[in-house]
């Protein structure tokens, strides 16, 4: 676990704008008309509509996406009763988590009131503002009364996350750990060390999942809770045992299958761990020091299935994989409550997710080759991008089925897409690419079949239904790797290009290539040798029509790939040059950037080809190009060197394509600021238009720009997309992720579809 110093923590919270959250306007406000609509007099209209029908508050205000994180500061993290104001940094932090994981807006509310009745009345009074209420850091037993009363008396979702968040995540972990251990929940003996809000809520949920009360022993600071003990709270009474033969943790733990600790550090010894049943499940959730350390538990017995609350060990029980998505599903159905059915739906969704193949982005975040379901991975990781869809959708369905939803979701695919877009996992353009590719999947050759990233991408592309993958590489190595990564190769062709069984194909390809390039110095023997190289072989598959598209680049430099592509595929006859483009999907919109990889120092003719290809490519993606050709000068302010080349290219393009919105040369700030450009240069062909296509003067500026934007923002980048080759040959780079390659595969498939349609005409 990363060591955090006091100085670093205080600096983090104080630097820049103090705190961690802010309110951001969601409507325009730059003109007087905007302000008149936002406030007086325009604001009166939605007020009157809400007066007539309070339900319309979900249509005209932020209520439907707004949660209150409310606390009185009586049980703050590991700090105890530090007061409402002192707990504000924690509540702001909770708001931050809601926003970054589920796109939910939060007001943190610190109520300086310990009396439960007065606290309840305060919360009820402000409840109309919110779509849901997350109670936080309120001590037991008051928290039980507060939550129960608010759930009864309000018509919006209310959840005390300290109780139910831990319960939901640990329940999902318990179901999966039991599956790994080969045990059934109704048969296991469970020992719970701790009797606070979290412990009792966890144990109640275990019972709801099938655990038997008579198989559960709960302990508090005095030992095993027995039914003959006087003055028990209602929650302790519920789990009090009639047994009189056990009093201590050491006695209770003998032969137990499950240990749940929500107490204090270092209370479970190695001897106690060893006294448990075979394949024991140990959830040591005290923070920051667990009841038994991960190292001690594993050293005491190798068959233990272990979870802690810490991120530096496997199977972390972390509430963040629950509460954002539970509220997301509740808000999206305008639910009146978060009920048991919704909580159980979340449990099963989280548990099921851990059994699915893990996205590459998760593996990369934890620097592992591949997480697979088992002793070291039975709870999903907080960074898993599927949580927003799987858990939110399960909760929303449960809300509808249990009758607490006021709004029904009818199109679940559309809802899933909206959730992905909400978190920036999917843009409209990406979705269109996939949908188009699915209509006519093509045969796509993946050059580096033995590379884990390429293999995962091919499998994912197949699962998405966008292509029929063909992997190049040693079939035995690929099959072994697929087994290690727990990937199915069903429906995926593997070609071992260097095997004797491919000799005839290599010879045929060599003859075709040597004949094609006979006047460029090629001979049959050299061509034969080249067919043992994956790029030559794969591109020849496309050239001969035995495949439709080709993806390469994880093992090969661009310069080498470009050389082979020119040799085998060639440039389209209407151009003398080819280039590449990257697409940037930002919050401001979609931008097309060229040339990002090929032409180092383009002259005027090369820039003209890049501009032509960019126009064609942007139109290929169903956008209308509005193109700025960039330089460090503006419209002839410098008449030498690079600006002059760009200037001449613009002149040519404007004459040849009078309908095209293109101008330059110009600096990038004028290209992207329409108001500034129109004020200073009102004569341009771009007047009043938002630029979406940027042609850079050289490779250095284009390449640096797209990588800078990719590194410093949340912009989705698709590319490189080749422009100008005769066939669909596309490149990746050595740092490409699985998602990058799948995106390029979708582009390659559409490229192949368009190519075939042209030839049919």
For each predicted feature, which ranges?
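Helix-enriched interaction subdomains in cytosolic or periplasmic regions
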Residues: 12-45, 390-423, 559-562, 593-596
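Rossmann-like adenosine-cofactor binding region
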Residues: 237-304, 310-312
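Adenosine-phosphate binding glycine-rich loop
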Residues: 2, 161-162, 181-183, 284-392, ...
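NAD(P)-binding Rossmann-fold cofactor-contacting core
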Residues: 193, 209-236
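Glycine-rich adenosine-cofactor-binding loop
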Residues: 66-78, 83, 167-170, 181-207
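N-terminal ligand-binding/catalytic initiation module
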Residues: 1-158, 353, 397-398, 431-455, ...
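Anion-binding alpha/beta catalytic cores of soluble intermediary-metabolism enzymes, centered on
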Residues: 85, 137-184, 406-409, 415-761
């Amino acid at each position: 676990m990363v060591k955090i110093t006091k100085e670093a923590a205080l600096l983090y919270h104080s630097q820049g704008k103090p705190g961690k959250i802010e309110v951001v306007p969601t409507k325009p406000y730059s003109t007087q008309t905007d302000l008149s609509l936002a406030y007086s007099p325009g604001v009166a209209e939605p007020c009157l509509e809400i007066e007539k029908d309070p339900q319309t508050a979900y249509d005209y205000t932020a209520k439907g996406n707004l949660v209150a994180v409310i606390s009185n500061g009586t049980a703050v993290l590991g700090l105890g009763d530090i007061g409402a104001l002192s707990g504000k940094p924690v509540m702001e932090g909770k708001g931050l988590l809601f926003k970054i994981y589920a796109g939910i807006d939060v007001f943190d509310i610190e109520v300086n009131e310990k009396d439960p009745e007065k606290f309840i009345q305060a919360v009820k009074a402000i409840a109309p503002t919110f779509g849901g209420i997350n109670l936080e850091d309120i001590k037991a037993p008051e928290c039980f009364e507060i939550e129960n009363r608010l759930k009864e008396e309000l018509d919006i979702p209310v959840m005390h996350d300290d109780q139910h968040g831990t319960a939901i995540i640990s329940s999902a972990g318990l179901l999966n750990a039991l599956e790994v251990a080969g045990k059934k929940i109704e048969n296991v003996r469970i020992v719970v060390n701790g009797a606070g809000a979290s412990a009792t809520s966890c144990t109640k949920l275990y019972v709801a999942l099938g655990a038997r009360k008579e198989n559960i022993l709960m302990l508090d600071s005095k030992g095993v809770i027995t039914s003959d003990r006087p003055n028990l709270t209602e929650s302790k009474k519920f789990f009090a045992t009639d047994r009189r033969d056990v009093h201590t943790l050491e006695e209770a733990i003998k032969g137990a299958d499950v240990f749940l600790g929500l107490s204090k550090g270092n209370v479970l010894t190695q001897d106690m761990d060893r006294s448990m049943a075979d394949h024991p499940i140990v959830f040591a959730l005290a923070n920051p020091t667990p009841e038994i350390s991960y190292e001690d538990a594993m050293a005491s017995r190798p068959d233990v299935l272990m979870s802690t609350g810490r991120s530096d060990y496997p199977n972390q029980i972390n509430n963040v994989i629950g509460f954002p998505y539970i509220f997301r599903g509740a808000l999206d159905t305008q639910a009146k409550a978060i009920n048991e059915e919704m909580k159980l739906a979340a449990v099963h969704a989280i548990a099921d997710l851990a059994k699915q193949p893990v996205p590459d982005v998760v593996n990369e975040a934890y620097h592992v080759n591949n997480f697979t379901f088992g002793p070291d991975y039975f709870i999903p990781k907080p960074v898993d991008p599927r949580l927003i869809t799987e858990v939110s959708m399960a909760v929303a369905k449960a809300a509808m089925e249990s009758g607490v939803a006021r709004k029904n979701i009818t199109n679940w695919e559309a809802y899933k897409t909206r959730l992905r877009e909400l978190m920036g996992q999917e843009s409209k353009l990406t979705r269109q690419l996939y949908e188009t590719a699915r209509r006519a999947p093509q045969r796509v050759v993946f050059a580096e079949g033995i590379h884990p990233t390429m293999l995962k991408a091919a499998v994912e592309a197949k699962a998405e239904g966008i292509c029929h993958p063909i992997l190049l590489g040693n079939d035995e190595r690929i099959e072994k790797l697929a087994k290690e990564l727990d990937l199915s190769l069903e429906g995926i062709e593997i070609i071992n290009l260097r095997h004797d069984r491919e000799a005839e194909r290599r010879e045929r390809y060599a003859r075709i290539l040597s004949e094609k390039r006979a006047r460029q110095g090629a001979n049959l023997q050299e061509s034969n040798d080249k067919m043992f190289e994956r790029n030559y072989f794969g591109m020849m598959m496309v050239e001969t029509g035995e495949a439709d598209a080709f993806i390469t680049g994880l093992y090969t430099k661009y310069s080498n790939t470009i050389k082979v592509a020119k040799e085998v595929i060639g440039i389209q006859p209407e151009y003398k040059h080819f280039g590449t483009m990257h697409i940037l999907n930002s919050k401001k919109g979609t931008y097309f950037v060229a040339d990002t990889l090929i032409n180092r120092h383009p002259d005027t003719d090369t820039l003209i080809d890049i501009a032509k290809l960019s126009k064609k490519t942007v139109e290929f993606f169903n956008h209308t190009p509005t193109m700025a050709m960039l330089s460090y000068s503006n419209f002839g302010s410098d008449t030498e060197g690079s600006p002059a080349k760009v200037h001449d290219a613009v002149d040519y393009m404007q004459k040849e394509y009078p309908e095209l919105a293109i101008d330059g040369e110009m600096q990038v700030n004028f290209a992207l600021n329409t108001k500034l450009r129109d004020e200073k240069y009102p004569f341009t062909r771009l007047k009043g238009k938002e630029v979406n296509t940027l042609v850079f003067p050289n490779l250095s500026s284009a390449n640096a720009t797209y990588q800078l934007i990719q590194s410093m923002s949340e912009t989705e980048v698709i590319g490189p997309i080749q422009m100008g080759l005769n066939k669909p040959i596309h490149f990746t780079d050595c740092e490409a992720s699985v998602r990058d390659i799948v995106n390029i595969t979708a582009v390659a498939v559409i490229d192949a579809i368009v190519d075939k349609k042209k030839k049919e005409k």
